[in-house]
Design a protein with these regions (language model features):
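Amphipathic alpha-helical hairpins
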Residues: 1-132
């Protein structure tokens, strides 16, 4: 079962799950797990990794919130989805920057996932931009 398929089956979606948002939700879910794992691994390192741990845990929480809101299709809350996509994008970029400061393999993988998630959020944003 995939997030995209589940969303497509929602009665209010009529078979159009918003592919970009579905991908962003899926990768934000993965990003949350990787950030949590990276924070845990950082806590076992001998170096002072407090800022990296904080960045990873903040990113995990934002990604989880974005995923939960993005998969809801009953009613509309376009402004909230847009704000969460923007926040997720920014938080993932900040977390990636922090992880890239460290040479640990878990930080490298976390940074890669954060960059991918940020790109997915960026791709999903146009459907939620304010009309000019």
């Amino acid at each position: 079962m995939s997030i995209r398929k589940m969303i497509a089956l929602h009665p209010d979606v009529a078979g159009d799950p918003n592919e970009e948002l579905s991908v962003a939700a899926r990768h934000a879910m993965f990003c949350a797990a990787l950030c949590t794992s990276c924070a845990d691994a950082c806590s076992a390192e001998e170096a002072d990794m407090r800022q990296c741990i904080r960045s990873c845990l903040d990113c995990a929480d934002i990604c989880e919130a974005m995923t939960k809101v993005a998969v809801r299709r009953t009613g509309e809350n376009v402004d909230v989805v847009r704000m969460l996509l923007e926040t997720c994008l920014s938080t993932c970029e900040l977390c990636a920057e922090e992880c890239e400061k460290h040479e640990h393999e878990h930080c490298r993988l976390c940074a890669l996932m954060c960059r991918e998630c940020a790109g997915d959020c960026r791709a999903a944003l146009p459907a939620f931009q304010l009309a000019a």
